[in-house]
């Protein structure tokens, strides 16, 4: 919907208690159905957007995790899996593995601190 999700994290940092991970892919060109998809089922090539397994869509999860680390978020990352083109068990497992891979610990020291010594 055009929301800057990284800025949203920074702006509402004190209101975030659970993070819901879900990926989506959207078309780079005009298609038969607009942004809201209307009457078309998920998985229909004429849709403007569709859900994807984590890491297979357009969402920049690296920037999301960095923003969450910046606000010192330590709560859960939950995965909601949806991808009409993939087997459910394989896709959900792949998404779970991806979520574990992208969830890196923030640095315990300031990178630039060594330059001030």
Annotate the PLM regions.
Residues 80, 107-117:
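Short, flexible loop/turn segments with low-complexity composition
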Residues 88-109:
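C-terminal helical cap(s) of enzyme catalytic domains, especially alpha/beta-barrels
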Residues 7-16, 63-73:
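Acidic (Asp/Glu)-rich catalytic clusters
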Residues 1-55, 107-111:
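Acidic/histidine-rich catalytic cores of soluble enzymes
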Residues 24-26, 59, 84:
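Short Gly/Pro-enriched loop/turn and capping motifs at secondary-structure junctions
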Residues 78-88:
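A short, acidic, flexible beta-alpha connecting loop/helix-capping segment that sits on the rim
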Residues 56-63:
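Glycine-rich S-adenosyl-L-methionine
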Residues 19, 54, 68, 77, ...:
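Conserved, mostly hydrophobic/aromatic
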